[in-house]
Amino acid sequence: MGILAGVLTSLIGTAVGLIAGYKGGAVSEVLMRIVDVFLAIPSLAFTIVIASMLPKMTVTSTILVIGALNWMWMARSVRSQTLSESRRDYVDAAKALGMSDMEIMFKEILPNIIPVITANMVMVITQAMLTEASLSFLGIGDPSAISWGKMLSTAFDSGAIIYDCLLYTSRCV
């Protein structure tokens, strides 16, 4: 579940960052102000509020909520790398060849920023797993799904009598 939410987060953040970094100007300003607004709100609290408003938390809705609310840091780092790459000579050569903006972004710039995306994706997946465990621990996650947060909640509710579950699960998280 955390991996899928991390992949969704990475896709949204990469798309927003690529567009903001390549287009620049007013487009970049508007997108980055939206990112700033989302970053001003604590992500776990915002996730809890959105998740509690849904009628039923399923695995799909958990993935969508986590993925849709954690893309901002990825967008910022992709934008900064895209700004750097968009000023290189190969981008000017692609423009001279008549490539469209979408082709330049996805065929020329994106392959060169894959290392940044990969490094950020590792952090995003970790954050998504911790967010999902937090939601499950608080009882907001999918009740039918088995998760580390639910295991910790069960051990905690039993007064930590099941210390093996509490100890090993908390170490894994």
Task: Give residue ranges: language-model regions.
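Glycine-rich helix-loop "coupling/hinge" segments at transmembrane-helix boundaries
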Residues: S52-M53, T82, T131-C165
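Generic hydrophobic transmembrane alpha-helix motif, especially the helices
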Residues: L8, I12, L18-E85, D92, ...
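Residue-level preference for short helical/loop micro-motifs built around acidic side chains
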Residues: S84, D89-D92, E103, K150
